[in-house]
Amino acid sequence: MKTNILILSVSSLFVAGTLSSCTESWLDVASKTESNSSNYYKSQDDGLRSLYACYDGWQRTVSGGPDFTLYQLTETMSDECFGGTGNTDGRNTQILDRFDMNEAPSYTDMHNKLWGLYYAAVFRCNEFIDKAEGISWDDTRAKDTYLGETHAIRAICYFDMVRTWERIPLLVHATKDNVPQANPDSVYSLIVKDLTYAADKIPADAYPKADAVTNDGHITRYAAMGMLARVYLFYDGVYNNNEGKPMPGGLTKDKALAYCEAIIQSGEYGLVNRFKDLWPASSDDKTGNYIDHWVDKSSYAGVGNKETILSLKFNYTGDYDGNEDGNRFVVMLGLRTNGDVYNRYGQGWGALTVNPKQAAVYGQGDSRRQASIIDCQQLQNYEQKYIADQREYTGYAIKKYTPLSKNMTNSDGTTSLVSYLQGDMAGDFMISQYQDWVLLRYADVLLMASELGSSHAQDYLNEVRKRAYTQSDGSLNGNYTVISATKENIWRERQKEFAFEGIRYWDELRQGLSVASNQIAEHSTVLLSGGVKEKVNIDALNIVKKRGFCQIPLTQITLSNGVLKQNAGW
């Protein structure tokens, strides 16, 4: 751990050259031209740049290229997907899918880079929080806003880590100490306190939704409130058997519900009219030949739409020189097409093939199935041309997050399908995908409020379900029915509404380890790997032994001189 933290102190340098390395020269002379930790953190502008550095650190947990981003990790472990990827690739993905190191025993460090990226982000937040009182603030509003966002970023990073590994070091100051793993309750207490700080301190009008074109991506007080509700429900399910007890940090069920109701009553958010318009690939209204300019006919609601409460932003400015800005999990999900740009979809690596069980959960007339899943069997010649290179082919792929194509006019006047990124700076389809990861939608707040016992629970559930069965003319199709707002029905609705959004696995764990392990288990399920039938078995006992948590990277245990201990079952 100690050596790794030394690396983190270097990686905490700010983007765009605003900070340089804080090393000691033999003369020990302060730089007159560059910023470092001794002459920085003076002005409010320094505070703003510090906040940007914290956002950058958080973004790099995805754009930094870990072996598995949190999104891919959780989708692989859920019952929504199989690991997939190429038929001759290493089987590290299958370790996650089966919760079984026997799939590839040498992969003892799968999550080492992800671990380091998260702690690098935490280091930046800690350093800014530690130094904030030394800044000459122009006004308290800016201070409250910037620090509120920073506390929220730290909380989100710790929430991701404690859900993934459970037993992690808790660092609340910028330190190089070799810190042992904390009691999870201590981590959750900090998460609650940080998010509460953000909900209290960030002004309600700091980033109005009406101005999303200029402020989208900033964490608002409502995003912090929504995350508090999510944290409460996860903790209550995993540690309190869904009994509605108070959790560490003093967060209660009533308070979590009040946060959801405050978001709903704010008037800032609402449901996008049609579910499919939430996603670029799903909002394609094109008919006819696939060579058409399908993007021009998209009904996509756009980034920062009225339903988005919290998202992690990306862009296409990344390169291989340390500027890491793209969404690295999108290309992993793309159709594996041997380098071809096929149909309206761009190329990818074929990870996270959709479990047919997930494709079967949607009722007749539920628009969410088509908006969420690519039916590869409906793509012209796809199976004949491409599945020989695909592992764990199921006939289905994720549509919500997938690379896209566009039609480009060549110099001779002909047209070609190319990657949607071609012509945009580096245009590298592997590192420049810029679709945002939407972390919290208004629909989630409605369903969390229902689950937490709102007096409007039935209305909130109906609102979400009606949207799923709404036709293009705005009317409900004949398949819509009202279902009662029981906890079990709400959980089933969440499976349909939030499929492939990085939510399902956590929802399964909070239903109880026995329920989760049996939902995820597979018994001789037949898939195609390299075009040949393969039986997949996922033993529920493997999940139970590990309690649903991931392997602590061996490198981190070694660097800590054994202070860090491996999780049970790994």
Where are these regions (language model features)?
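Bacterial N-terminal signal peptides that target proteins for export
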Residues: M1-S9
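Bacterial Sec-dependent N-terminal signal peptides
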Residues: T3, V15-S43, I191, A229, ...
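Long, intrinsically disordered, low-complexity segments
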Residues: C22-T23, Y118-A121, N215-D216, S282-V341, ...
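An aromatic- and glycine-enriched ligand-binding surface/loop that stacks and positions planar moieties
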Residues: T23-N92, T196-Y197, H218-E392
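Conserved, well-structured interaction surfaces
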Residues: N36, S43-G64, G86-W165, K176-S189, ...
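Flexible, polar/acidic helix-loop-strand segments at domain edges
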Residues: Q94-M101, P356-R441
